[in-house]
């Protein structure tokens, strides 16, 4: 992988690449020759199966300090992350993660966020 600071125009950040939709989107973007960086809580779980040329960085949308390096130089971000916590904590964690990501993306100058909503 390369350093997040090596980002150039057209860089895409993909969150949720270890999930069903994210994994397929990663493959499709890579097949189209897109430059893709993936944010993962456990990068080792993704790095071994990511297509060649994919940059995998550690981060968590609930930990704001991990987002700025991942978003550096990104043009478009795909937000495919949703909390799977049980009970009342689910909604608050999901909101907090999305809010953190949106604020960090705005600060980083990300031009477009594609948000996948999958729950009722």
Task: Name the predicted role of every residue range.
Residues 16, 81, 114-118:
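Active-site beta-alpha turn of Rossmann-fold NAD(P)-dependent dehydrogenases/reductases
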Residues 16, 40, 61:
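Conserved residues at beta->alpha junctions
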Residues 11, 75-76, 112:
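Structural motif
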Residues 2-34:
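N-terminal Rossmann NAD(P)H-binding glycine-rich loop of SDR-like oxidoreductase domains
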């Amino acid at each position: 992988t390369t350093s997040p600071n090596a980002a150039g125009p057209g860089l895409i950040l993909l969150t949720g690449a270890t999930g069903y939709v994210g994994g397929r989107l990663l493959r499709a973007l890579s097949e189209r020759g897109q430059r893709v960086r993936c944010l993962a809580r456990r990068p080792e779980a993704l790095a071994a199966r990511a297509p060649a040329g994919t940059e995998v960085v550690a981060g968590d949308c609930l930990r704001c300090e991990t987002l700025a390096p991942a978003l550096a130089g990104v043009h478009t971000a795909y937000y495919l992350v949703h909390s799977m916590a049980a009970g009342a904590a689910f909604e608050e964690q999901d909101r907090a993660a999305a809010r953190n990501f949106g604020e960090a993306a705005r600060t980083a100058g990300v031009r477009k966020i594609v948000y996948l909503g999958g729950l009722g």
